[in-house]
Amino acid sequence: TAGRFLEKRNGDGGYMIIIQVDDFKDSKGLVEKNDIGVVWETDLPEAKAIHLHPKQMGGAILSLDWMNPKESWKWAGPEWTSHISGPITGVDGVQIQSDNPETMFQDWLEVLGNPKSSKEKLKIFLDDTWLEFILDSDGRGPGISAFSLKAKDHDIINKRALELGLISDGLICIGGITFYLV
């Protein structure tokens, strides 16, 4: 599924947005209520997850994941927190582009259970991050266009990106994705 999605976008880029949910049963119920196809599912004592069909959701494969305990992240292994280092402290938000961002915003809003949002800004607010739906700006079609990252040291990140040739029009760009630092 991911490979076909990236082919449609003509190259590298982000293909999945993972959202940790508090109540997996409720989240899965919203998916079923909205008649969205599931392309992958797992049901383990410590983790449950479903990947929603990207053709129906648009923009990315949406993964709804539940962890037990909530602070864990099975996919990263049991010791993942001891490997956190560097100037990035978290994900602030994600921009998803579309030729019809209003419709995509509404579809995602409904599947996510109508959390706090701004219809004027086409922005969905989650616990400590956001999803923003914007007009296709690069002609690659629907998909992840940018990540906004929480960072401790912008200078060191920008310096390293410049050394690696990852600056385009003054912005960090990696694999077809723009990275903003906040």
Model-derived segments and spans:
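Short, surface-exposed ligand-recognition loops at beta-strand->loop->(often short) alpha-helix junctions
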Residues: 21-22, 94-103, 150-151
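A conserved mid-domain beta-alpha-beta active-site/ligand-binding segment of alpha/beta enzyme cores
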Residues: 90-97, 108
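Amphipathic alpha-helical segments
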Residues: 24-35, 100-115
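Eukaryotic phosphotyrosine signaling hubs
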Residues: 10-16, 141-145
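Terminal peptide-recognition signature
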Residues: 17, 108, 147
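Vicinal oxygen chelate
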Residues: 28-93, 123-140, 148-149, 155-182
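Conserved donor-binding loop and adjoining core beta-sheet/short helix segment
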Residues: 1-4, 8, 181-182
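Short N-terminal edge-element motif at the start of the domain
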Residues: 5-13, 27-33
